Amino acid sequence: MTLQPAATKIDADAIRAEFEILTSETVQTGESTDAAPTASNKLPFPVLSDKALFGLAGYVVRKIEPHTEADNAALLIQFLAGFGSLIGKTAYFEVGADKHFTKLNAVIVGASSRARKGTSWSEIERLLIRVDETFRECIQNGLSSGEGLIYHVRDEQTAKKPIKTKGIITEYQDEIVDAGAAEKRAFVIEPEFARVLQSMKREGNTLSSVIRQAWDTDRLRVMTKNPVKATEAHVSIVGHITEIELIRNLDETESANGFANRFNWICARRSKYLPDGGNLAESDLNEAVRCLNEAVQFARNTERIKRDDEANQLWHQVYKRLSDGYGGLLGSVTSRATAQVIRLACLYALLDCSDIIRLEHLEAALAVWQYCEDSAKYIFGVSSGDKVADEIFTALQSSEAGLSKTEISNHFNRNRTAKEIEAALQTLLELNRIEKVEEKTQGRPREVFKVSANEKDEINEISISESQNTGLNSLNSSNSSSNKGN
């Protein structure tokens, strides 16, 4: 006799309730919002302006988007960085004595491992390799030391070999001991960027220093007894990390020493649910491959890039805001805004087969930077980089009436000096987190500090003549319309 399992009654309501809990993040038109603001981060998730999806870059993202759960911003920044690496050390924009080549670093930050950060690279990689099969050998991972990074793009190494005559050394001759790397392009994709940050904490590790060198110049070297060096290096790095891992592993040293501001920080989340995966055929990308081939050939035959008059006018209008930036931790990670925007604009121009940065190229670059800046605010914005300032801000959040300096001192049980409190308040004022208000009294006005009603976003407050609805004001409008559509 065969025993049959007892029939199990399916509780559809219970299953539905459990599913709603698991997918409690708002889902609209098949989209997911993995990265809902946490208790410590009340800023809205960044919105990518349509301005950023200009030209070939936008065409590629829109072609891939229906077939992936990846975030459009992650697709876009990796396409731009990959293109800039693929073309090599050719086109550049000159600022004084400095040349900005098309090297772009980025870190894609997901609220969790479900943000589909890794998925965002696979389709971009497939497209780039179709254009240049040799680029496959340029793609590296496993960053752990500065010497290791240099080794991949190292120069030829020689040693002095003694020449003897009748047993006596009469001269020395250079002998090649290492032919070096013929390929000077390196595109480092790090799906576990937390490991990179952990490696940099080891005593004597040179990775942070070399990464900074690689962004600044084409000459890489470390001061060791038997140094390996590289010239003409063209290195770009893209990392993937979760927000928790980033906050845990990016210490104050790396934020302050210029490591963090050589990266574009990109918030990413799952864009949609595709239970059966995507279905992007090779033929779907044929037109993108053709256009990208043209852009690559053009870029490899281009040297100096310039701005036209219209783009230059907009650049003059946004330059002060980009240069001034922010204070505190947010300022530390976004302080190379001008250089990042220049490189982004160059990439949009080259993708358009132009050696002139036109208005639309600069607008696209500014839209990407706006997203990077908003991402940095979302990730780092609640921390000023000053523990005293952070505690004061928390105290002010709990006091609608605000607090005077005396009350703030009492909050610390007078364990903080007036100088420390003054410096912390100044940091919060610079970040526009708080405002200073004078309240009338019978005698001397009372100075009170309160949380700002609205966070100031100077990048969208730049005054542009009423007759010219361009630049960051129009980018802000585009963002607003995008928000309405979502």
Language-model segment annotations:
Residues L3, I10-N486:
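Phosphate-handling catalytic cores of nucleic-acid transaction enzymes
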